[in-house]
Amino acid sequence: DVKDFRINSGYMEVMLSDGITAYQDIGSKDSKVIVLVHGATLGSLAYEEYVNVFLENNYRVITYDQYGRGYSDRVVNDVNIELMERQLQELIEYCQAENVILYGVSFGAAVVAKYASNNPDNISFIGYQVPLIDSANVPLLSLIKIPFYGDLLSRVLFIPTALKRIKDYEHLMSKKLMDHYLDQFKVKGTEKFFKEFFIGNAMGNRMDNHDVIGNNDIPSYFAYAEDDLEIDSLLVKQAIEKYNNPTVKKYLGGHFFSSGIEKQVAQDFIDSIEKY
């Protein structure tokens, strides 16, 4: 049960419209605030190195687990991008954060793009790392959407694939993080959440959101790898073109290029903020 899973997590909890959100709000309330949004499977615990760098640079930092992941509730109805945006919006309001700096990783970049396009006046800077722009060309997701077959496929293929995927990076992860990642899949409701997550619109096309953000001249930062096999780098380049003079950092190493160099990547983001 998720209640048992989050015992002794060290996270704070708040009941939002759709369930309990586990979050951390660290640093001086008088400092500029960075809200960091994790990706589709790795929860916020994966970004402790980023948080430390942000704090060392005197920023306030808010991180949280999106519904269905980490220590937050397993929401299994109406799992869509609007749910994830609503969670982010309500948490920002609850924490009384204004003129926020957003940093989204992978699917988290889709969430911050959705939020920023609807709340441009509350964003002072936005950063994307390996941003998901559109997952329409991912064959596995198309198969999962097939009735009945999709249920079986998500159980016998997706979950094992997600577990194997992260084990390739086990040597770069702490035992604490690896155990947390594996254990979250044992929490009741996680499997059903992911099935609903992938058949809905959560991973749909966000290019229109980038259009709006770019038109509002919000200062921006992109970090991605051209050899990323999970994110279409051509779509990332198209999104970048929507922005006015964004900071762009290219790396090698695929979707998880930041593994082992988290401090460098986090500091690169801070340096890009402080140029403005």
What are these regions (language model features)?
Residues 1-34, 56-59, 98, 250, ...:
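Alpha/beta-hydrolase fold catalytic core
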Residues 26-71:
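Conserved HGGG/HGGXW glycine-rich cap/lid loop of the alpha/beta-hydrolase fold
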Residues 66-103:
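Active-site loop/oxyanion-hole signature of alpha/beta-hydrolase fold enzymes
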Residues 104-112:
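Gly/Ala-rich beta-loop-alpha elbow adjacent to hydrolase catalytic centers
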Residues 117, 123-153:
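Flexible "cap/lid" loop of the alpha/beta hydrolase fold
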Residues 137-139, 156-214:
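Conserved alpha/beta-hydrolase catalytic His-Asp/Glu region
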Residues 216, 222-224:
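Short beta-strand/loop motif that positions the catalytic acidic residue
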Residues 253-264:
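Catalytic histidine-centered segment of alpha/beta-hydrolase-like enzymes
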